[in-house]
Design a protein with these regions (language model features):
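Short, hinge-like loop/turn segments at secondary-structure boundaries
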Residues: 54-55, 120
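Core segments of cupin and vicinal oxygen chelate
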Residues: 11-53
Length: 161
């Protein structure tokens, strides 16, 4: 069995690279990312855990505008430390003229988020789960690890033969 240990990077194809770079460069800095690398028509940022890249779409790709409910990318959520960070992100977005589609608020029980658009209209989110969600996620992960470990033990393998 192969186990994914995390998502390494995400690359968004953008319609106007320079316009998107002007949007993403200060946003990524605000979110604690540093520049990983920049090439012609491509730029990436890293925060030690995640790599986030933008790349210029080719001419054919520019003809197909992003629409949230099409097959493929729906939205990307940046998990933040706390509700205050979500509120700070909204203030940053407002100060920088970003389009906020759903303002900071509790969208589900114990789930606080702000939703906004990039220059191509791609939906992004800054969010924070509350303590109840974190504890439930930790319990689910522990159960999965225990079940996986049990399948790998010699006595468990004998039962499956």
């Amino acid at each position: 069995m192969v186990e994914v240990v995390g998502v390494d990077h995400l690359v968004l194809s953008v319609g106007d690279f320079e316009k998107s770079k002007k949007f993403y460069a200060p946003l990524m800095e605000f979110l604690g990312f540093g520049v990983e690398a920049e090439y012609e028509g491509m730029m990436g940022w890293a925060n030690g855990k995640t790599l986030f890249w933008i790349a210029a779409a080719d001419e054919e790709g520019k003809e197909h505008r992003y629409r949230k409910d099409d097959i493929g990318f729906h939205h990307y959520a940046f998990r933040l430390r706390n509700r205050e960070d979500v509120d700070a992100l909204q203030a940053y977005l407002e100060q920088n003229g970003a389009t906020i589609v759903d303002p900071a608020g509790e969208y589900y029980d114990d789930y606080y988020a702000v939703f906004f658009l990039d220059p191509d209209g791609m939906k992004l989110e800054g969010m924070r789960w509350g303590e109840r969600h974190e504890q439930a996620a930790k319990k689910r992960a522990a159960k999965r690890r225990a079940a996986t470990a049990k399948k790998r033990t010699p006595s468990a393998r004998k039962k499956w033969r």
